[in-house]
């Protein structure tokens, strides 16, 4: 535990996981070649609400890219091919949002679309391309002064292509829904959620269909101005419906098949004005981690 990655035997690769056993280090070897680096960011925002008679609409378009390679061109940045030999890395991300609200902030609805392509060419054995797209809607409606009803639905596609290890190639697509009720009191905050989703796709030549349903509670209790304690409890049950015993890590939001239980608690408290204490206790139980406990704490002194 407490690493950055875990090894997936089915895919023959390391998967990013905050509970994994492996820590990643970068060790340069071999000859060094001259690379051209280019980074860029574009942000466009049009807020109709600032006009005198404008509607309650705000539109955002964001783009950022990061490129390294011996050759720079439009196609290398926007649409790199898997067989490219002149690219070290090419990452592109686009985000579009349309935000609809009301003047009294009693409701809000947001439509969003995001897509990214991450070309990774720093493995001497070959290249990989990680593609991702997500389109959805979320928002909230005020029920009372201290309570809101929140919702989100989205459809996503995740695609991994590799030209040197066939087992790594996989594709996942599906949709997820979540509805939440939030209650905000003077000394506490609470949120109750129900979520459901279905993912399907393939791993190399094997197809799968998986579904999951779960509940979540997130709460925070304040001790005046001295500190607070937070609790997050997540319980879900996931099933594979096509008699395939394995699902890729991109499916079911990274959870495993079967029952998944996750509990996270954290405490922050000021003992004195210049001394504070923080502690977190985490518990995880699923097919991948059996009754995993992690405890961390620290004292801080402020000069």
Regions found by a protein language model. Give the residues of each.
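Exposed, low-structure sequence patches enriched in small/polar residues
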Residues: 1-303
């Amino acid at each position: 535990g407490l690493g950055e990655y875990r090894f997936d035997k089915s895919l023959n690769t390391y998967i990013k996981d905050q509970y994994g056993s492996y820590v990643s280090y970068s060790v340069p070897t071999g000859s060094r070649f001259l690379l051209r680096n280019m980074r860029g960011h574009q942000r466009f925002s049009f807020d109709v609400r600032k006009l005198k008679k404008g509607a309650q609409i705000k539109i955002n378009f964001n783009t950022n890219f990061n490129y390294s390679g011996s050759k720079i061109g439009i196609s290398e940045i926007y649409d790199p091919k898997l067989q490219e030999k002149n690219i070290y890395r090419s990452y592109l991300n686009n985000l579009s949002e349309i935000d609809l609200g009301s003047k009294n902030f009693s409701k809000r609805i947001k439509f969003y679309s995001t897509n990214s392509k991450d070309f990774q060419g720093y493995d001497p054995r070959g290249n990989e391309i990680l593609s991702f797209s997500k389109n959805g809607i979320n928002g909230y409606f005020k029920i009372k002064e201290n309570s809101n009803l929140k919702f989100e639905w989205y459809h996503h596609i995740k695609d991994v292509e590799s030209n040197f290890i066939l087992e790594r190639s996989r594709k996942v697509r599906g949709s997820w829904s979540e509805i939440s009720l939030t209650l905000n009191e003077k000394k506490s905050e609470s949120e109750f959620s129900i979520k459901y989703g279905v993912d399907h796709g393939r791993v190399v030549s094997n197809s799968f269909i998986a579904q999951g349903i779960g509940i979540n509670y997130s709460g925070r209790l304040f001790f005046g101005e001295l500190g607070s304690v937070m609790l997050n409890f997540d319980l879900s049950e996931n099933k594979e419906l096509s008699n395939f015993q394995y699902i890729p890590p991109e499916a079911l939001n990274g959870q495993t098949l079967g029952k998944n239980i996750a509990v996270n608690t954290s405490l922050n408290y000021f003992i004195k004005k210049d001394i504070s204490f923080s502690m977190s206790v985490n518990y995880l139980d699923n097919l991948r981690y059996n009754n995993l406990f992690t405890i961390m704490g620290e004292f801080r002194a402020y000069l």
